[in-house]
């Protein structure tokens, strides 16, 4: 019996190959139960001759905390974006904009980074993705259709607010934002949005030098991280900060970043670290590796160092100074104010730890942030590798040397959120005896007790002279004024604006050929503001700018609708708040400077000065955008306008000029 079973087994083994040959699909079906993969490209991709982009939404899950308010409920979502070069031209430094509009927060994106900064990114108004590794999209022709070189898939994970059900809300649009490309409106079907972008035939590209890495970008603040010298365990880096915005500014700047691979700063020139903790160095990975190093002489071992500019007296110091554009006490001004103060440079010796112990291992720090005092808020993107920076040869010969490696970080000015500004504006006009003060909590209400005041109430109208009085001394006057004008006021009065700097825009006159206004700056802080500047965006009416009498003024190109102004030479100093004549009785007096501005109406068509054209659309102080009132002063019925009102304005400007001069000369 055993012999018979053995014969049957051998016979079966001999027949198996014949069965497989005769019925090949039988064995395949038994071994593999998965359906055949469909490699057919999307119809839009097959028809596109240019750059194809798509966005596909996945499901979403409800996050904590759970709330009954549907618009406040947070959901996690996943989606996939794809960009493919289907044309005959390589796309350098591709930039894909996704028009999110449901308060999305992008937590991660594989294959790409956001130009708005490191994750998580607030994408409420959309965000632009750029390649993290595959920064350029080569053509299918030159790569034999290698998808890894002609395309990038972006797996997006994030948080979205509001909506119903488990379907993820779709973005408004997707488009390629590179120069010279145009995209039609994207088409949507189901949970997928797609578009085919093509070259704009009318676009005339500027002649560009071919680059190995991503071309350098333009922003409000341009930071370059150059590696100048390289050793096995360390390298010398130079950081250059360029203020390229006509309205950008930083005072006492603080720069911070995050080391990602255990590096530390051994020494610095042209700047210094705010904190120096030897114990932190000894307990780090670097302290274990560099056992014989005297860490008491090390500049900083923090993962997130805070770096500051040196004061001016250190400029010629042999150890810490003697660098061009260094040592200005953290001041960065616009180029047209002072080119020598529009740039900052410092150098640092960076020590590395294993496994980066070779001369070609460079990893720039990430999560760059920079801020100042009463300055605009900057949002910095990730460091992007660019072609090496050229430098004049230090020998003095007509030769050029290059950095070993260079990265660029772009920082742009962000618009302040409501109740988060650092300066505010009040409105008044010659045809109304009530002034509209700064908005409630214009600069935030975090440091006050909102139980005693209403943080959301509209401010009470005031007599114009009350704008000179600190907020704490306005309450009684505001109530009396409301009673005189038969205006109701709430039992719980509005909270203050809490701004250290405020501006008053007073519409002074409106006549046939022109109009005038008076701008007044108030400093409610204890510290004086040096080298201040302001800017007024007046829209179409700004084209008629004629003169500003007590300040230096000029138009800001290219639109010429924004008026830039600063103090006259030797008078660009806005003092802080001071005590009244009798401190026990009189309120404090803010630092104040003012001037009249005149405008023409010729060749500007119809202007409704009182209806809104005579009030600024945006106001800036030291680069920071100030919060504006939500409405204008109303014209009283029956009031006539007279051009003769312009004469007192000029006299007021002259009087103000002499008063400021006398105050500065006497030191009061």
Swiss-Prot record:
InterPro entries: COB_C, COBRA_pln. Keywords: Cell membrane, Glycoprotein, GPI-anchor, Lipoprotein, Membrane, Signal. Belongs to the COBRA family. GO terms for biological process: cell wall organization; cellulose microfibril organization; pollen tube growth; pollen tube guidance. The keyword Repeat does not apply. This is COBRA-like protein 11. Involved in the deposition of apical pectin cap and cellulose microfibrils in pollen tubes. Implicated in pollen tubes growth in the female transmitting tract of pistil and toward micropyles, via the perception of ovule guidance cues. It is a lipid-anchor; GPI-anchor. It comes from Arabidopsis thaliana. The keyword Signal applies. Mostly expressed in flowers, stamen, anthers and pollen, and, to a lower extent, possibly in roots, stems, leaves and siliques. GO terms for cellular component: apical plasma membrane; side of membrane; vesicle. Its main location: membrane. Residues 1-29 form the signal peptide.
């Amino acid at each position: 019996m055993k012999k018979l079973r053995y014969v049957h087994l051998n016979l079966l083994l001999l027949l198996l190959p014949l069965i497989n040959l005769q019925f090949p699909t039988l064995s395949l079906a038994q071994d593999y139960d998965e359906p055949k993969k469909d490699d057919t490209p999307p119809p839009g991709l097959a028809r596109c001759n240019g750059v194809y982009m798509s966005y596909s939404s996945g499901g979403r899950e409800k996050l904590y905390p759970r709330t009954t308010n549907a618009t406040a409920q947070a959901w996690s979502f996943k989606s996939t974006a794809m960009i493919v070069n289907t044309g005959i031209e390589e796309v350098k430094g591709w930039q894909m904009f996704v028009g999110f509009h449901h308060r999305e927060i992008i937590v991660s994106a594989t294959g790409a980074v956001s130009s708005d900064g490191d994750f998580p990114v607030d994408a409420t108004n959309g965000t632009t993705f750029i390649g993290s590794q595959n920064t350029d999209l080569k053509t299918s022709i030159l790569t034999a259709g290698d998808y890894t070189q002609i395309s990038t898939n972006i797996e997006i994970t994030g948080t979205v607010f509001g909506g119903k059900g488990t379907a993820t809300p779709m973005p408004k649009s997707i488009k390629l934002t590179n120069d010279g490309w145009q995209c039609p409106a994207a088409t949507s079907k189901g949970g997928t949005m797609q578009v085919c972008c093509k070259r704009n035939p009318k676009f005339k590209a500027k002649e560009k030098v071919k680059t190995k890495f991503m071309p350098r970008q333009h922003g409000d603040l341009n930071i370059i991280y150059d590696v100048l010298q390289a050793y096995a365990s360390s390298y010398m880096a130079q950081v250059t900060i360029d203020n390229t915005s006509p309205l950008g500014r930083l005072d006492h700047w603080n720069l911070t970043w995050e080391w990602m691979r255990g590096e530390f700063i051994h020494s610095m020139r042209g700047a210094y670290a705010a904190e120096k903790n030897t114990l932190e160095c000894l307990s780090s990975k670097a302290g274990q590796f560099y056992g014989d190093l005297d860490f008491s002489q090390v500049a900083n071992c923090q993962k997130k160092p805070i770096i500051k500019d040196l004061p001016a007296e250190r400029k010629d110091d042999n150890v810490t100074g003697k660098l061009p554009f260094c040592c200005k006490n953290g001041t960065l001004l616009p180029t047209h104010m002072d080119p020598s103060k529009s740039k900052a440079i410092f150098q640092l010796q960076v020590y590395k730890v294993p496994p980066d112990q070779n001369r070609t291992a460079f990893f720039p720090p990430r999560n760059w942030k920079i801020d100042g005092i009463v300055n605009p808020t900057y949002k910095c993107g990730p460091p992007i590798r660019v072609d090496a920076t050229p430098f004049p040869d230090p020998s003095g010969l007509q030769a050029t040397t290059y950095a070993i490696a260079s990265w660029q970080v772009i920082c742009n000015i962000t618009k302040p959120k409501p109740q988060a500004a650092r300066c505010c504006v009040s409105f008044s006009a010659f045809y109304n005896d009530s002034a509209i003060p700064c908005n409630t909590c214009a600069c935030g209400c975090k440091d006050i007790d909102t139980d005693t005041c209403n943080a959301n109430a509209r401010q009470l109208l005031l007599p114009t002279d009350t704008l000179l009085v600190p907020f704490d001394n306005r309450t009684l006057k505001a109530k009396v004024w409301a009673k005189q004008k038969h205006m109701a006021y709430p039992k719980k009065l509005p909270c203050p604006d809490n701004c250290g700097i405020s501006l008053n825009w007073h519409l002074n006159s409106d006549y046939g050929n022109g109009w005038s206004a008076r701008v007044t700056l108030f400093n409610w802080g204890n510290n004086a503001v040096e080298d201040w500047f302001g800017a007024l965006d007046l829209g179409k009416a700004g084209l008629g700018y004629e003169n500003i009498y007590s300040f230096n003024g000029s138009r800001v190109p290219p639109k010429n609708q924004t008026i830039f102004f600063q103090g006259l030479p030797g008078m660009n100093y806005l003092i802080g708040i001071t005590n009244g004549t009798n401190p026990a009785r009189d309120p404090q007096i803010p630092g104040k400077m003012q001037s009249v501005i005149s405008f023409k109406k010729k060749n500007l068509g119809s202007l409704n000065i009182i209806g809104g054209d005579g009030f600024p659309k945006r106001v800036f102080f030291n680069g920071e955008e100030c919060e504006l009132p939500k409405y204008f002063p109303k014209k009283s019925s029956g009031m006539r306008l007279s051009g003769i009102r312009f004469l007192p304005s000029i006299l007021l400007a002259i009087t103000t000029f002499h008063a400021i001069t006398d105050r500065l000369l006497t030191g009061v």
